[in-house]
Swiss-Prot record:
Subunit-structure text: Binds to the N-terminal domain of the chaperone ClpA.
Encoding gene (name): clpS
Lineage: Bacteria, Pseudomonadati, Pseudomonadota, Gammaproteobacteria, Vibrionales
Name of the protein this chain belongs to: ATP-dependent Clp protease adapter protein ClpS
Organism of provenance: Vibrio atlanticus (strain LGP32) (Vibrio splendidus (strain Mel32))
Protein family according to the UniProt entry: Belongs to the ClpS family.
InterPro entries: ClpS, ClpS_core, Ribosomal_bL12_C/ClpS-like
Amino acid sequence: MSRNFEWASPGSDLLEKERTKVKPPAMYNVVLHNDDYTPMDFVIEILERFFSLDIEKATEVMLKVHYEGKAICGTYSAEIAETKVAQVTMYSKENEHPLLCTMEQV
């Protein structure tokens, strides 16, 4: 009895796995929310320190927070966004300000 077997070349199953497309990571906006107690200068400091914004851009974002109630500080992967939110929250509490910082999926 003769049987015909088709032998796969070594590593051919790996090639198929490499062809599958990898989805880009989910991105998140880090958002600052307005309150009646946090000084504008402190918000600018946060934006410069944790989001590396220059003074002009930080002032623009701070004014958007002030007049519109919230503003996006930056867009990051989940882990980086979580870290930014934690850093801003901790720094705000250390300085006795109730500034709210959240993340929202894009």
